[in-house]
């Protein structure tokens, strides 16, 4: 047996072991490949299962969340269903308070749902439905609101003013309903019911005033006819306007009880168009006055009175300084101020047109005309006062000497100034009549008016003529508003004026009596000299002749006014009787045959003088 090398044998054994290891490695590698392949296939199979399982878990959580949401709004949904039934009914059936309360509760439900932002996304349909339900409910509320307001429809204000009745107004229950609805919608700029309120009230007033507007388009029914106080339709329009605006103000206070800050804006929105229309009609009437100032001039005072009333209406309220109204007021003031001077100028022109004195030295047509105008002037006292307060006396006084006026003081206030104007007008009328009488009776002499102490030819006749006209003036003053305008200071001026022309009338009687004032000296024995006796005889003769002539002249005067007749008799008696009695008693025993020179005893003279007053 051949020998085997040990090293070779080790190599053979090692090689054989390596072969076995390689074979085993190949088998392991093959097994691992199979495992890897199987693992890959398993992974692909389990991925969808895991994904599905994940989705199922998410869905489970969503379902659980939904169940939680449904559970949380179960009660809200139940309440909403009940409220929906209420809101679908008529407000008159449900009752306004319950209807509004239900709307508030629905709004609360929506607030709760909106707070649950995640849940709301799943129940958007419920929220949308509730929003639509609220919109319908609020729309019905607006309709109900409008129907409440429309219970008062446009009406003719004149019907109520003629009957002295209040304009229609809402009952307390209706006011409470209107206020409740306004309060529900709250204080917002786009508040729909506030808009409804403002529009409805504005149209109600404008459409009601439209009944009166046609009567504001003319001042008198016929052209070229003087305006009669109170006859213009604009007065009724103003009265209704003031009543309506006052009513709107009261209504706003009544229904905006819980929204006081909204009142001024609401008032302006309603009243501004109404005031605009008023000023437009006012402007139209001012233009009518300007077109015929002679007939319609005094109407400007009435328009001013109306404006003053409107100013009082808006005092302390919005719109109190309305520009259009202030412009109309300024223009009217200018027109009214011109009337004062125009009347004074008219007096001068009217008296200057006299061609001759009345045959009975009586009342002239000029006096009647002027006093008629002055009487009408006095009917607008408040308008005159408003105008004259910014004027001065010099603005109407004509160019006359200061001594012709019965007063020289400067008035301190509007009332005194107005009294002064009327007295100045009466003064100017009388001195103008006197001036014209002097020109007619003494054409060759320059007139000197208002000067009772100067000797003017035919002074008694002039005095009687003016006094006759003053008598009519006094009668008109007493029977008209002139009396209240004049007040005490004006009445005193009229007395002074009357006294001036009584002095005119009594001037010849005064001269007659003054003739008895000449000094004749009697000696201590009571005798007078022959020369002085002749003077006394002459004085008695002149007195007798003058007295008879003056009595005759007096009787030719047709004095029909008892007061004037009494006044003149008293004046003459006071001038003549005491002086004659003193002279008579002093010299009655100076003659052997007194009756030859002394025609009247004091008693006989007094009887004649007293007869003048009968």
From Swiss-Prot:
Subcellular location: Bud; Bud neck
PANTHER family (UniProt xref): EXOCYST COMPLEX COMPONENT 7, EXOCYST COMPLEX PROTEIN EXO70
InterPro entries to which the protein is assigned, alphabetical: Cullin_repeat-like_dom_sf, Exo70, Exo70_C
Signal sequence residues: none
Record family assignment: Belongs to the EXO70 family.
Function comment: Involved in the secretory pathway as part of the exocyst complex which tethers secretory vesicles to the sites of exocytosis. Also plays a role in the assembly of the exocyst.
Keyword Repeat part of the UniProt annotation: no
Assigned GO CC terms: cellular bud neck; cellular bud tip; exocyst; incipient cellular bud site; plasma membrane
SUPFAM superfamilies: Cullin repeat-like (SSF74788)
Any one Pfam family match given in the protein's UniProt record, by short name: Exo70_N
The keyword Cell wall biogenesis/degradation belongs to this UniProt entry's keyword annotation: no
Organism encoding this protein: Eremothecium gossypii (strain ATCC 10895 / CBS 109.51 / FGSC 9923 / NRRL Y-1056)
Gene this protein is translated from: EXO70
Name recorded for this polypeptide: Exocyst complex protein EXO70
Record keywords: Exocytosis, Protein transport, Transport
MF terms in GO: phosphatidylinositol-4,5-bisphosphate binding; small GTPase binding
Major localization class: other
């Amino acid at each position: 047996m051949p020998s085997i090398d040990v090293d070779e044998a080790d190599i053979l054994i090692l090689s054989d072991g390596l072969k076995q290891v390689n074979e085993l490695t190949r088998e392991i590698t093959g097994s691992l490949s199979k495992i890897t392949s199987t693992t890959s296939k398993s992974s692909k199979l389990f991925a969808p299962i895991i994904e599905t399982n994940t989705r199922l878990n998410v869905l489970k959580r969503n379902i659980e969340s939904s169940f939680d949401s449904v559970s949380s709004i179960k009660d809200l949904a139940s309440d909403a269903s009940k409220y929906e039934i209420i809101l679908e009914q008529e407000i008159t059936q449900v009752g306004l308070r319950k209807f509004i309360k239900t709307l508030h509760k629905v709004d609360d439900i929506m607030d709760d749902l909106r707070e649950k932002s995640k849940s709301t996304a799943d129940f958007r349909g419920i929220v949308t439905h509730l929003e639509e339900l609220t919109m319908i409910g609020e729309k019905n509320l607006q309709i109900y609101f409008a129907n409440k307001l429309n219970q008062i429809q446009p009406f003719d204000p004149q019907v109520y003013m003629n009957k002295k009745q209040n304009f229609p107004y809402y009952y307390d229950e209706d006011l409470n309903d209107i206020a409740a609805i306004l309060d529900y919608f709250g204080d917002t700029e786009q508040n729909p019911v506030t808009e409804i309120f403002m529009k409805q009230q504005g149209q109600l007033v404008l459409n009601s005033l439209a009944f009166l507007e046609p009567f504001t388009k003319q001042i008198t029914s016929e052209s070229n006819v003087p305006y009669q106080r109170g006859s213009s339709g604009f007065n009724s329009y103003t009265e209704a306007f003031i009543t309506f605006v006052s009513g709107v103000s009261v209504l706003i206070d009544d229904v905006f009880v819980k929204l006081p800050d909204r009142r001024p804006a609401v008032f302006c929105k309603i009243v501004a168009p109404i005031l605009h229309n008023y000023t437009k009609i006012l402007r139209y009437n001012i233009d009518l006055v300007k077109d015929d100032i002679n007939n319609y001039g005094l109407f400007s005072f009435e328009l001013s009175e109306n404006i003053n009333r409107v100013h009082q209406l808006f005092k302390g309220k919005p719109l109190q300084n309305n520009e259009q109204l202030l412009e109309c007021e300024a223009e009217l003031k200018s027109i009214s101020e011109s009337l004062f001077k125009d009347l004074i100028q008219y007096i001068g022109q009217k008296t200057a047109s006299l061609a001759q004195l009345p045959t009975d030295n009586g009342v002239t047509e000029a006096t009647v005309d002027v006093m008629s105008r002055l009487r009408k002037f006095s009917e607008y006292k408040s308008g005159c006062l408003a105008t004259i307060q910014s004027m001065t006396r010099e603005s109407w006084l004509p160019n006359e000497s200061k001594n012709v006026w019965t007063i020289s003081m400067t008035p301190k206030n509007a009332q005194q100034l107005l009294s002064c104007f009327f007295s100045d007008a009466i003064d100017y009328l009388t001195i103008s009549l006197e001036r014209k009488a002097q020109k007619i009776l003494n054409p060759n002499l320059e007139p000197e008016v208002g000067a009772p102490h100067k000797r003017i030819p035919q002074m008694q006749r002039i005095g009687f003529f003016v006094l006759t006209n003053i008598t009519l003036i006094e009668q008109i003053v007493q029977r008209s508003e002139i009396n209240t305008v004049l007040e005490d200071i004006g009445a005193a001026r009229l007395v002074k004026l009357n006294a001036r022309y009584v002095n005119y009338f009594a001037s010849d009687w005064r001269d007659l009596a003054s003739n008895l004032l000449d000094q004749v000296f009697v000696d201590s024995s009571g005798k007078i000299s022959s020369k002085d006796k002749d003077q006394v005889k002459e004085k008695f003769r002149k007195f007798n002749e003058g007295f008879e002539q003056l009595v005759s002249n007096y009787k030719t005067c047709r004095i029909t006014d008892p007061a004037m007749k009494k006044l003149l008799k008293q004046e003459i008696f006071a001038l003549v009787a005491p002086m004659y009695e003193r002279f008579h008693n002093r010299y009655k025993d100076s003659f052997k045959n007194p009756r030859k020179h002394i025609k009247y005893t004091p008693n006989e003279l007094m009887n004649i003088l007293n007869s003048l007053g009968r």
